[in-house]
């Protein structure tokens, strides 16, 4: 049930969690070829991490295809959320999405707070508008809760402190492909000694010592596409309790 709720959030942000199956069931493959291709596809954005100053994205161009209109410099969208289930089978989820328009060199988005319930109760959701100037998040809406206000104004995206320079050293991952979409997934067991894991533990309340899984998902052409997307998840979930961080960086047309 909680997985369905988690998918619901991703759908609202066009980040669709796809259960990777083929017509006959799971289509698992082995071998390094596809695994290497998936990592190389991810490295096009992960090699940019850490992006300490998000305004650097104004001067970076991503993959362009026929979806871009002439003269459109494109828009980067960066997203991070942290979701944690509790003993009441509820799921609390907080995060931020920011759109950086390279044409206008402006960045606008929102911070969201969501709670999903196990029973037939609609989720609670609140969005708080933000913008970014001089690499600083500026809260545009009034927030009464001082702790929430502080979390919003001090928010850092995973891509601002993550480092995947050693991505090529991740090997023997569990690879899955759905040729019908197409979509590609690979999972790796991480170590608690990993600097990215240490960073997340220092920033979020993660009530488990369980080493997480690194899950990389690509929807669309491995070579690149402004229609598809890539999603990275670090999953600390344990004994049916959802605990995970989702990261997303995409480059798409800014002009419709």
UniProtKB/Swiss-Prot annotation:
- Which InterPro entries does the entry link to? Csa (IPR007595), Csa_sf (IPR038641)
Lipid-acceptor residues (N-palmitoyl cysteine): 23
The annotated topology with respect to the bilayer is: Lipid-anchor
Identify the PROSITE patterns for this entry: PROKAR_LIPOPROTEIN (PS51257)
The secretion signal range is 1-22
Instruction: Tell me the keywords, alphabetical order.
Output: Cell membrane, Lipoprotein, Membrane, Palmitate, Signal
Q: Where is the lipid attached (S-diacylglycerol cysteine)?
A: 23
Cell membrane as UniProt keyword: yes
One Pfam family cited in the UniProt record for this chain: DUF576
- Tell me where it resides: Cell membrane
GO CC annotation: what is one? plasma membrane
Stored NCBIfam families: SA_tandem_lipo (TIGR01742)
Q: Which family does it belong to?
A: Belongs to the staphylococcal tandem lipoprotein family.
The protein's name is: Uncharacterized lipoprotein SAUSA300_0414
**Species name:** Staphylococcus aureus (strain USA300)
Q: What is the lineage of its organism?
A: Bacteria, Bacillati, Bacillota, Bacilli, Bacillales
């Amino acid at each position: 049930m909680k997985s369905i709720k988690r998918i619901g959030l991703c759908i609202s942000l066009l980040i669709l969690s796809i259960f990777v199956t083929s017509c006959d069931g799971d289509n698992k493959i082995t071998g390094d070829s596809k695994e290497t291709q998936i990592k190389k596809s991810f490295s096009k954005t992960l090699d940019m991490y850490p992006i300490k100053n998000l305004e650097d994205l104004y001067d970076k161009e991503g993959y362009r295809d026929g979806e871009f209109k002439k003269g459109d410099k494109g828009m980067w969208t960066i997203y991070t959320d942290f979701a944690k289930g509790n003993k009441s089978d509820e799921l609390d989820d907080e995060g931020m999405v920011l759109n950086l328009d390279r044409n206008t060199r402006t960045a606008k988005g929102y911070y969201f707070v969501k709670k999903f319930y196990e029973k037939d109760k609609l989720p609670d959701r609140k969005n708080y508008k933000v913008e970014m100037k001089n690499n600083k998040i500026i809260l545009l809406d009034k927030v009464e809760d001082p702790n929430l206000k502080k979390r919003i104004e001090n928010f850092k995206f995973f891509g601002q402190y993550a480092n995947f320079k050693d991505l090529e050293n991740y090997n023997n991952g569990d690879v899955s492909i759905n040729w019908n979409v197409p979509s590609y997934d690979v999972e790796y067991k991480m170590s608690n000694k990993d600097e990215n894991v240490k960073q997340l533990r220092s920033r979020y309340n993660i009530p488990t010592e369980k080493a997480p899984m690194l899950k990389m998902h690509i929807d669309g052409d491995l070579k690149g596409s402004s229609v598809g997307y890539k999603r990275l998840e670090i999953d600390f979930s344990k004994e049916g309790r959802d605990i995970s961080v989702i990261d997303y960086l995409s480059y798409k047309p800014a002009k419709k």
